[in-house]
Amino acid sequence: MLGHDLVSHVRSAMLNKLRGLPVPESHPVLSQLRAGVFVTVESIVRSGGYERREVRGSLGIVEPFKDLAFDSAKVAAKLALSIPRFTEFDLRRSVIEVTLVEGLREWGGDLGSFEWGREGVYVIAGNKKLVVLPQTMIERRLLGPALLRYIESMVGAPERMYKFATRIFYELRPEGEVIERELWKSRVIRQYLEVVR
């Protein structure tokens, strides 16, 4: 239920922003919750008889500013305007993914205690900041030492690193059923864990 409410709220915020209408900043359930939130928009691309998803844009905050209804609507509205040539028509043909971020805590880079598929990373290096969500780790095969190499290649030597827990809610089809992604069950992570054990 939370996933459906959250994705529906985000989609409404994006649609209203694209139409020039006020963005819904409250919700009976979401206004009671506090969490960081990332919103991702993926277009459905059909080519050669296959269908794939292509990220159009992603934006978020690692710590809550206000409540989840307010924060998710503001992030979604800003994202809708930041995607080049993004229209109502594009939104109707796109799937929405919302990642909740909770429990931000310092992390020394210990890979042995890292919960692959459940945790993400927030890194600060000077004026550079980087967020790596669990889905990015799987898509780019950033498991084990590859994650630390990726961080260094993106921001240089990190001054501070944090990890956080996530819950990922995802539309199966545009405006369709919403599921909670269980990335820790992915084949990529299982194969990695078999090798390191």
UniProtKB/Swiss-Prot annotation:
PROSITE patterns: AMMECR1 (PS51112). Residues 1-190 form the AMMECR1 domain. Pfam families: AMMECR1 (PF01871). Coiled coil: none annotated. Disulfide bonds: none annotated. InterPro entries: AMMECR1_dom_sf, AMMECR1_domain, AMMECR1_N. This is Protein PAE0830.
